[in-house]
Amino acid sequence: MSENNKPRYPLQQILVEDLFSSNKLVVLLLIGILVSAMGTIWITHKTRQLISENGMLILQRQALENEYRNLQVQEATEGDSTRVESIAISTLKMKVVSSEQEVEIRE
């Protein structure tokens, strides 16, 4: 036979057959390692997403707490009786009624 006419062996087929026939444990371990690696990557990704979401929720909670405190201060300020009296006198031109000017209506 000449050099070009030598029979060629299908190397890929031989390797695959050898791998699955005599190295089943190695193949199973390799599959296990790949599954474990993908699981680790997925868990890490989900953990980072949850940490990011937690940070955003903390910022929202702080903003809501600040707004609540501001509303409490505003309510205390606007509900103050001296402020209400001053607005009634200056804006609405109301006057304080003396006891002689009071009229009591009975039925």
Swiss-Prot record:
One record GO biological process: FtsZ-dependent cytokinesis
Record membrane topology: Single-pass type II membrane protein
Quaternary structure annotation from Swiss-Prot or TrEMBL: Part of a complex composed of FtsB, FtsL and FtsQ.
Positions on the Cytoplasmic side per record topology: 1-24
Organism in which the protein naturally occurs: Haemophilus influenzae (strain ATCC 51907 / DSM 11121 / KW20 / Rd)
Protein name: Cell division protein FtsL
UniProt family annotation: Belongs to the FtsL family.
Keyword Cytoplasm (UniProt): no
Function comment: Essential cell division protein. May link together the upstream cell division proteins, which are predominantly cytoplasmic, with the downstream cell division proteins, which are predominantly periplasmic.
